[in-house]
Every structure is written in C-alpha cells, then in structure tokens.
UniProtKB/Swiss-Prot annotation:
UniProt motif 'HIGH' region: location: 68-78
GO cellular component: cytoplasm
Name of this chain's protein: Isoleucine--tRNA ligase
Gene this protein is translated from: ileS
Source organism of the structure: Prochlorococcus marinus (strain MIT 9313)
Pfam families given in the database record: Anticodon_1 (PF08264), tRNA-synt_1 (PF00133), zf-FPG_IleRS (PF06827)
Placement of sequence motif 'KMSKS' region: 625-629
PROSITE patterns found in the cross-reference section: AA_TRNA_LIGASE_I
Family: Belongs to the class-I aminoacyl-tRNA synthetase family. IleS type 1 subfamily.
Gene3D superfamilies: 1.10.730.20, HUPs, Ile-tRNA synthetase CP2 domain-like, Valyl/Leucyl/Isoleucyl-tRNA synthetase, editing domain
Length: 968
C-alpha cells in the first residue's frame, strides 16, 4: 500500500477556519491567585456559601468542629482536617441536607499565657495583674483567630464565619460552668489530695491529653537495698522450717537481710513509705557472694544475677502474702516502714518484684497507700524543688541535681546495688517540651469511675471510622483514672468555688453555681477576677463574705473544649445534638473525643456524636514529622500562593491543596512534599484540560435547540453516558463512605482513560471536521453537555473553585446560577444500559492492542500519526467477534465505525492477509496487521483517502471534507 503526495503546483489553502475549533473563556491555566478569590466572593454575594445549606429542606447534618488552638500559623494538619470537613459538608449540602458549619477555636490555656508574657519586659511582668494578663491573652487569642480564619477562608472552606464559637465567649464560658455544675450536682466533681501529672516547668497539673512521650528519654535506674528491721512471726517460722534462721536484733538483721527494690526515679526515695509485693508471687531469700541475703522475686533470680553481677543462691522461698508486715529501715533517713500487699501492677517483667512505694508520687503507690493507711508524703514543691520534708536533700531540684545527689548518698551508705541509664517512655509537658513528675496536690477531679460503665456503653453506640477507633477509645476509658480538671493558671474558666479563710470547708452548691453562672453569662469569666467575694457570692451569703475567699484555679482546657457540645451543638440554631459527626486527628481519642464523651455521658448518659472519623498526621515525603530543624515543613500558604522562588515553589491554588487531601488514605499518616504536589498538580491539569475540551466544543450548542434524545444517540455516546452513570454511582458511594481517595482515583481514571484517551480522542474528527449542525456532531455535543454538568457537580465538594468556574463558563443557559444550586449529580435511567458493557470492554481491549502495535511502528520511525496507517483485523475470541457483530449491526454508520474508533485511515476485518506490512501481531484477542494507508493526506481532516485531488475546487481535500464545505 502506498501513500500519494499532493499534486505539484497546487497552491495550498488553509482550511483552519472551516474547522469547528475550541472556543471557551475557561482558561487552560487556573490563574488561581486571582480566580479563586473571585469565585469565593461570588459565593458570598449570592448567599451560596452559608444560606444554601441553611435553607435546604432535607434532614439536618451537623459536623461539629473540634476547635483548633488559637495560637500559631496554619499548618498541613489544619489543612488536612478543615478540607476533609469541608468536602463532607459540601457533599451534604449538595444532597439537600441542612448544614450550618460553625467553626470553633480553643482560646484558653498556658501557651497563650506564655506568649503574652514573652512580649513583656521584667518591669511589665511585675506590674501585670491576673486581670490584665487575661485581657492581653484574650486580645492575643482573638488576633490569632482572625489570622487563622482568613487562611481557612482562602482554602474555600464554607462556614458561618460571622458567628464562630470561641471558648472565651461569655455564652460559652457560662455553658461550661453549667456543665461543671451539673456534674457536681450528680456527685461527679470532688476535691482531693492525689498524685497528678505535674509540670514543674509550667507549675501546674496536667491531664493525660496534655502529655507527650518523645523518643530518646533516659532515666537513672537504681537497684537499692533496704535493710530489714523486724520480721513478722509467721514469716520467721516459715523461714525456720526451710532451715533459714535470722537474727532478732534489728541492727544485725539489717546487716543479714536487705530488701532489693528498683526505681527509675531516685528522687522519690525520700518520699518512700512502704515496699509493696504481690501476694501471689514467690519471693526468695537469696544469699550473695558477700554472705548477705537479698529479698527478690524468685522468678527474677537468673536475670538479677546478671544485672547485679552477684552470685545469688536461694536459701528459702515464700509467698508474697507472708512478707506483709516485715519492717525495714530507710537507707537514707531515720524512718521505719512496712512491706505491704500491693496489686496486680507488681509483676516480674522488670525490677526485683518488690516495688518502692511513695504514695505522694504515683497512682498505684497512692492507691496502695490508701488501702494500708500509709499516709501521704510529698516533699516536692510546685517548681520541682525538694522541701524540708526531704531532710538533707531539701533545696535540690528533682529534674536536675536531686538524682545524682541521692545516688551518691546511696553509694556512700552501701545501699546502692546497681546504677545504669534506662531508656523508656516518659511523659513530657506538651507545651514546654520538658519532663513532668507525679506529685500529690489538692486538685479538683471528675470521678470517671462514677460513670465509666455508661461511657463504655455509649462508645458502643457510636460508629467509629476506622473501626479500630472503638477499641482504642474503650481501652482508654476503661483504664483511665479520674480526670484532674483543675489548673494553677490565670487564663481560663474559673473553678467557681470558695474556700474558708480560717478553716478547711469548701463552699460549692447549687446556689453559688447559679449565681456565678448568671454573672458569667452577663459579664464573661473576667468577672471572677474583677469582683470580690461580696459580689461573687449569692445575696444569701453576703453577710458572711469575709469568711470565704474565691479560688484561683482554672479548668483544664480539655474541659473547655469538651463542653462544646453543650455550649454550641445543643444550643445554637441549625445544629443538632447528638451531632452527626466529629472529625479530628487520631490523637483526639485521648483529647477532644474523650473529654466530650465524658462530659456528655456524665450529664446526659449519651455520646455527643453518632460517628467519629479520625485522620492521621501530615508527614514529609520520607515519612518524617515536619519540623523547622529538619527544614521539611510544608506550608499550606506556600502551596496556594507560592514561595519566594515561584519556579521552585509555584502557586498551585487552593484546589490543588484540596485535591491532595482527597488523594490520600487519611486513615493513616499521609505524606506531602514537592514531588507529591507536582503529581497532584498534574492530575488537576488533566481534569481541567478535559473540562476545557468539553466546554470548548460546546460553544455553538444549545441543549434546547440542538440536543438529541439519549435513546437516539449513537452507541459510542450512549456507552459514554452509561460509563458516566457507573462512575457517578461509584463517586457517590465513595463520598457516602468518606473514601475520598476512591473519588480521586475514579476522577483521574474517568478523565484520562475514559474521556481523554478514548471517547474524546475518537470524537475529535466529528467535532472538528463535521458541519456545525451535523447530527454526528450534535450527538457528541449532547453527550458532552450532559457529561460536563455532572462532572462539575461530582468534583464540586473537592475542586470547588474549578467546578464553579466550569459552571460560570457553560456556553448555554442553565436554570441555576451556581453548580452548588444544581445539587448532587444524578443520572436518568435512560443512560443505563448494562448490555453495552461486555461488547464495549472487548472493543476497548482491541483498540488498546491496535494502539500498542501502532506505537511500535512509530518508535521504529515507520509511522507518524495513526491516520497514516491501514489495519487488518482477524478476531480470535468469540467474545470479540460478538462485539464486532454488535457494533456492525447496532452502530450508527456515521459515528460507530470501527475505523473511526481506531483512528486509522483504512480498516479491513477478515479477508486475505496483506503482503506489504509494517507490523503484524497475533494474540489471544486477534491478529493485527498494520500497513501504510493508500491515498493522500487530506489537508483538512488529515485522513489518507484515495479521492484526494479529484475535486478541482479543493484539490487537497477528500470527498467528505469537500461535501462539508459545499454544504456550509
């Protein structure tokens, strides 16, 4: 087969103006820095970004916003969280549900207090009263809220921005006081002296949620020998029966027998009041190579021989129960203390099996101390400095010089068996990044024990996404202790309690609570610092106001945010309680999810949410946590607006940021970085270019005038609508299940594989070359108009700006002024024809196989465009033959020709094999032969036809193109 050249001497005419080329104002580039704010202003002016959700007639959908902390610049964690919420809200609005998203901010707490103090010099600090500090903190928080709000809005987040909730608002603070009051009335609030997590660096108690456990912490681990002073008779008898006789004299007994303990907090040894054992364990009296007996758990003897480098041989073994009542001497202080029975926390996993017990410095120690009436000793002040109760160690700091000093003293007394560093998880203050301690103080607690079972029941009523969240929350609530809710800080909601000035009585009752709540409702929590006891107490107590002093503690910030269901969701118009959904990072199982659950269950015996969805953390491309020191911080503002070097950090716009959020499996930690952003931007461009192609080919199309009924469309168009229906169904399911990565995958495949590479690739000829109003062109435009409207709707929860831009650039009129007023895209049943799926699958497989052979020819320089080729096919599979018959019998002759679908100039199915071949391939599907197409290239449609040159008016055109021009 040969290809002819154009006749010599023929003047070439440009036929570009006779083609139906793209016409659209929808840009190839997004110009996001200008266009996105314009679209956001359009939504605002048209009442789309708020009123649309408020005015919907469907069921209420409340996604309650977990308040971010009002401090610092927005980061990728904010972006992941807020965009996920916005995608869900926009989808629900499109589904016709009533949505009012109220954004919130957590405004109290130490970080803001510290920020205020950092900006003051020493003189200003000294002049700072608590009330002045609060005023400055409130101003700082509000400024941070304004800054963060502007960032959220730039991301295209829809919310009731004019009415956010801030935990510093007086109505919020009053609702929080009411939550506290109701819990108090139910007996769930109490004051007690208990060991709590204490931060010497912040000088306040901390809740579990305010702790972090950084890698790399080591503590000084010591094995210590406590000399025995007196044995209970039952124990002495049991030892005698085993042939072990011990001295009666206390001094001699102490030299002969010593109790071995292990601790990683040597600084707590001055507070030791007992040694605890497990009554069920076996304990050995083991002689070492110095002739001394050490009391240790029998099971640990082999490991202790290695650890202590001692020859330890058991002389006698008894159950732990027999050790109760053994008296020992403190190795550093003049104090005798007993061995007592502890609990199941005493194991043989580490240490010696005997536990140094300081009730003032540990929860298990405290509980054991309560059980055995050991008393309380906590010789450490709020800064971590040892008090006079620590004897010779007074003045030492427990996190600095106390440990080495005490270890040296133990060694000097001969009581130190071993000293080595020990790496383990240790709690740090999440704000100051410094170690915490356990310290017994008078604090206010919420008695979780009082409603633990109800909380566990409530957890089971919630749908947790992912499902593992249920087990995580159950374990935390089942194992947690009572909640320490008091803080020794100024910037917060006051614990509304009065203390007797001369005695120990506490004044807190329904009357005082109601009075304080009324004052805060009117004036805000500052009133607690602005007024004296005469005004803060109810009138009935005014006469004895001098007897009382107001408390200075504030509430844990987790109690603040944990009251949001009461202050916001259950109070404000357009919201619902229990809410449909809470959505935050996975760290909130021990934070906001839990504090909200506890307060809601305590008061109303139900969870505040029906669903809880968690996401992971944003990491760099190597899976590392972002930090300034590593230089791997990805700034969402730079993603949107670009960096200093815009070639290296181009301005991608908010939609690319949003598309990234949709692309990740957020149930785990998610990576983000320059190369990932380039990939996401590439997908964005493909979706945009596909949309632009659809819009550009509709410039002369009016659906009312030009559309063809769907049942009358050619097979190719009907299949494309059937495929669109499938994709829309799958996208709807993905959104319903919050599986946005499935949306991302479906969108990419639909735009690239189904539309660009197949349907639109085939459609170019009939779109460009046909007469403008020709049926083969109008049928394609009909399908394209139906597709672009649904594509715009389907992407609108994620690519909200692009979707609206598409809608504003539709070249024909539609009833709705915004894509969001159209609602969630649906497809008529006339689009659905599952019988097309099997034959179309075969034909697409055939097209892919032919393209591979053509590509091989191109790579070898034997072919340029596919239209230079002629192809002969021979079907091998029955399924393909049936598909070819189906296409031939049911296809539209002007559109559904296999030659046009393969984009070649000539096609032969069956018949004799060709002689002059460029390539030939046999596979299970078919025999594919490729040769050069006969004829010459038409200057207008680029097909190779044998009739080119036969038309004197247009000597470089094929007969088809001549016919089109003559018709025009």
């Amino acid at each position: 087969m040969t290809q002819g050249k154009q006749p010599d001497g023929v003047a070439r005419t440009s036929y570009k103006d006779t083609l139906n080329l793209l016409q659209t104002s929808f840009g190839m580039r997004a110009n996001a820095s200008q266009r996105e704010p314009e679209l956001q202003e359009f939504w605002k002016q048209q009442g789309i970004d708020l009123e649309l959700g408020l005015n919907n007639q469907g069921q209420n959908f409340t996604l309650h916003d977990g308040p971010p902390y009002a401090n610092g610049a927005l980061h990728m964690g904010h972006a992941l969280n807020k965009v996920l919420k916005d995608i869900i809200n926009k989808h629900q609005i499109l589904r016709g549900r009533q949505v009012r998203f109220v954004p919130g901010w957590d405004c109290h707490g130490l970080p803001i207090e510290l920020k205020v103090l950092q900006n003051l010099n020493q003189e200003q600090r000294e002049a700072l009263t608590p009330l002045k500090l609060r005023k400055k903190a409130a101003a700082f928080a509000r400024k941070q809220v304004d800054s963060q709000m502007a960032g959220f809005r730039r991301w295209g987040i829809w919310a009731d921005w004019e009415h956010p909730y801030l935990t510093l608002q007086k109505e919020y603070e009053a609702a929080q006081i009411q939550v506290f009051g109701k819990m108090f009335q139910k007996g769930y609030i109490y004051r007690g002296l208990k060991p709590v997590h204490w931060s010497p660096s912040s000088r306040t108690a901390l809740a579990e949620a305010e702790l972090e456990y950084p890698d790399g912490h080591t503590s000084p681990s010591v094995y210590v020998a406590f000399p025995a002073a007196k044995l209970p008779e039952k124990l002495r008898t049991s030892l005698g029966n085993q042939g072990l006789e011990l001295p009666n004299n206390g001094l001699e007994l102490g030299q002969a027998l010593q109790i071995a303990i292990w601790t990683t907090t040597p600084w707590t040894l001055p507070a030791n009041l007992a040694v605890s054992v497990n009554e069920k364990l076996d304990y050995s009296f083991a002689v070492d190579n110095q002739g001394r007996l050490l009391l240790v758990a029998a099971e640990l003897l082999p490991s202790l021989r290695d650890t202590l480098a001692l020859e330890l041989t058991a002389r006698a073994t008894v159950k732990g129960a027999l050790l109760a009542g053994l008296i020992y001497k403190h190795p550093l202080l003049d104090r005798d203390s007993p061995i007592v029975i502890g609990g199941e926390y005493i194991t043989t996993e580490s240490g010696t099996g005997l536990v140094h017990t300081a009730p003032g410095h540990g929860v298990d120690d405290f509980n054991t101390g309560q059980k055995h009436d050991l008393g309380m000793l906590c010789p450490v002040d709020e800064s971590g400095t040892m008090t006079s109760e620590a004897g010779p160690f007074a003045g030492l700091n427990v996190l600095k010089d106390a440990n080495p000093t005490i270890i040296a003293a133990l060694e000097e007394r001969g009581a130190l068996l071993k000293h080595e560093p020990y790496a383990h998880r240790y709690p740090y203050d999440w704000r100051t990044k410094k170690p915490t301690i356990f310290r017994a103080t008078e604090q206010w607690f919420a008695s979780v024990e009082g409603f633990r079972n109800e909380a566990l029941t409530a957890i089971n009523s919630v749908e947790w996404l992912p499902a593992s969240g249920r087990n995580r929350m159950e374990a935390m609530v089942r194992e947690r202790g009572d909640w320490c809710i008091s803080r020794q800080r100024t910037w917060g909601v006051p614990i509304p309690v009065f203390y007797e000035r001369e005695g120990n009585e506490v004044l807190l009752n329904d009357e005082t609570l109601a009075h304080v709540k009324a004052l805060i409702t009117e004036h805000g929590a500052d009133v607690w610092w602005e007024r004296n006891e005469v005004e803060l107490l109810p009138p009935a107590y005014a006469a004895e106001a001098e007897r009382w002093r107001k408390g200075t503690d504030t509430m844990d910030v987790w109690f603040d945010s944990g009251s949001s269901w009461a202050a916001v969701a259950s109070q404000q118009e357009g919201l619902a309680y229990p809410t449909e959904l809470y959505l935050e990072g996975s760290d909130q199982h021990r934070g906001w999810f839990q504090s909200s659950l506890l307060t809601s269950v305590a008061i109303n015996s139900q969870a505040p949410y029906r669903q809880v969805l968690t996401h992971g953390f944003a990491l760099d491309e190597k899976g590392r946590k972002m930090s300034k020191s590593l230089g791997n911080v990805v700034d969402p503002a730079v993603i949107i607006d670009g960096g200093k070097n815009q070639k290296q950090e181009p301005p991608y716009g908010a939609d690319v940021l949003r598309l990234w959020v949709s692309s990740v499996d957020y149930s785990a930690d998610v990576p983000i970085g320059a190369s990932i952003l380039r990939q996401i931007a590439d997908v964005y461009r493909k979706v945009r270019n596909t949309s632009r192609y659809l819009l550009g080919n509709l410039h002369d199309f009016d659906p009312e005038r030009d559309a063809i009924p769907v049942p009358e469309l050619p097979l190719l168009d009907r299949w494309m609508l059937q495929r669109t229906a499938e994709v829309m169904d799958e996208i709807s399911t993905a959104f319903d299940r919050y599986e946005f990565y499935r949306f991302f995958q479906l969108l990419q495949s639909y735009c690239v594989v189904d539309l660009s590479n197949f349907y639109l690739d085939i459609a170019k000829d009939r779109l460009y070359v046909s007469s403008p109003s020709e049926r083969r062109r109008r049928s394609c435009q009909t399908a394209m108009a139906l597709i672009i409207e649904r594509l715009a709707g389907a992407i609108s929860p994620v690519l909200c700006h692009m979707a609206e831009d598409i809608w504003q650039n539709l070249p024909y009129s539609v009833a709705e002024d915004s894509v969001f007023r159209r609602g969630w895209p649906t497809v008529p049943e006339t689009w659905r024809d599952p019988s097309m799926m099997a034959p179309m699958h075969q034909l697409r497989e055939l097209r892919s196989a032919v393209n591979r052979v053509l590509e091989d020819c191109r790579s070898q320089g034997e072919l340029g465009a596919a239209l230079e080729a002629a192809v002969r096919l021979e079907a091998h599979s029955e399924a393909l033959q049936e598909a070819l018959d189906w296409l031939r019998q049911q296809g539209d002759p002007d559109v559904d020709g296999l030659r046009d679908w393969l984009l070649v100039s000539h096609l032969q199915v069956g018949g004799e094999p060709w002689a002059e071949l460029l390539a030939s391939q046999d596979n299970a599907l078919a025999t594919i032969e490729v040769a050069r197409a006969r004829g010459s290239k038409c200057e207008r449609c680029w097909h190779y036809e044998t009739d080119v040159g036969q038309h004197t008016t247009h000597p470089t055109l094929c007969g088809r193109c001549v016919g089109v021009l003559e018709h025009q």
